[in-house]
Amino acid sequence: MQSRAYALISEAALHHNLSGLSARAGTRLLLPVKANAYGHGLELIARQAAAHPDVWGLAVATPREAQAVALLNLGRPVVLLTPPTPDEVVPLADLGVRLPVSSLEEAEALPVHARAHLKVDTGMNRLGARPDEAIRIGQRLAERGVLEGAYTHFATTDEEDLSFAHEQLRRFRSVIAALPPVLAHCANGGGILSLGHLGDMGLSRPGLASYGFAPAHLQRVVPLTPVMTLRATVTQVHKAFAGESVSYGGLWQAPRDTTLATIGFGYADGYPRNATLRAHVLVRGERRPVVGRICMDQCMVDVTGLEVRAGDQVECWGSGDLTVSEVAGWGDTIEYEVLTGLGERVERVAVP
């Protein structure tokens, strides 16, 4: 059975973005594939990324994600960015997953065959050890022969004021300087685009930027192409007569006799319900409004004057004039939330 909505995932666009970001950073990449690869499909993106020479490894947020990627046997290291539970440490180490460490207790608990990445809190106040303590932990990991990397996370590199980002970088470098050589990584996508070359780091971790998106003031730094195009199937074409209402609540009434196409994509699939009465889609390359309230499984589009039939495809977002950024704006949210909220009913399809 075919899906009513599907996401085309462009390997060419992904590789284009990865090449540009790696060149800008002056490092190889540790590509975040957490949250189902930002909604793009974990296995699909992991396989596409592993084929790119600038990708050193793949970063995940949960032990289950780490296990899933490790079992693909792609020949790229898998780095877990958030703490596992004590009973998960050995099974993950057995799979070769690189483990985060932010306390002496965690450092001592690692098996001898583990590879650790020291987590340093330079100001995000989310995870990690503060710099002074991180140095002690890192030195102990080095003594045990399990220290491979060290990392931190920038809090403000998407902003125009980079003063705090520079302070975080200074703090992180003070830790790195006190340790034996490690694979250091700190730059997210915003960090790569705003701070530029960080060749003293071994790796960079561009998330959303790898999938084609950047803050407005940074969009010209590295040309990026959205990796995903979202298409949905027309399930019915019918008439609404002048004055009739469409969808729940009667929020929209037809100003004239109107041809409507119902498409199989709704808020259960990830289309923001808050985009009601603002959203548009592309029908045969032409922008057409989504009318009435967006439903759980479908929505209705004004296609008056166009030749449309059941089974046709419409584009809900892509790499052209109608992007996820615009959809997120209609939904009063951000690209991250739209992409990671894309439901499992939406089939991910690899394209060249």
From Swiss-Prot:
CDD domains assigned to the protein according to its UniProt record, in alphabetical order: PLPDE_III_AR
GO annotation terms (biological process): D-alanine biosynthetic process
Residues that bind substrate: 126, 296
PROSITE patterns: ALANINE_RACEMASE
Enzymatic reactions: L-alanine = D-alanine
Domain of life according to the entry: Bacteria
Pathway(s) annotated for this protein in UniProt: Amino-acid biosynthesis; D-alanine biosynthesis; D-alanine from L-alanine: step 1/1
Disulfide bonds: none
Enzyme class: isomerase
Listed GO CC annotations: cytosol
Entry keyword annotation includes DNA-binding: no
Pfam families: Ala_racemase_C, Ala_racemase_N
Single GO MF descriptor: pyridoxal phosphate binding
HAMAP family assigned to the protein according to its UniProt record, in alphabetical order: Ala_racemase
PANTHER family: ALANINE RACEMASE, ALANINE RACEMASE, CATABOLIC-RELATED
Reported function: Catalyzes the interconversion of L-alanine and D-alanine. May also act on other amino acids.
NCBIfam families listed in its UniProt record: alr
Family: Belongs to the alanine racemase family.
Name of the protein in its database record: Alanine racemase
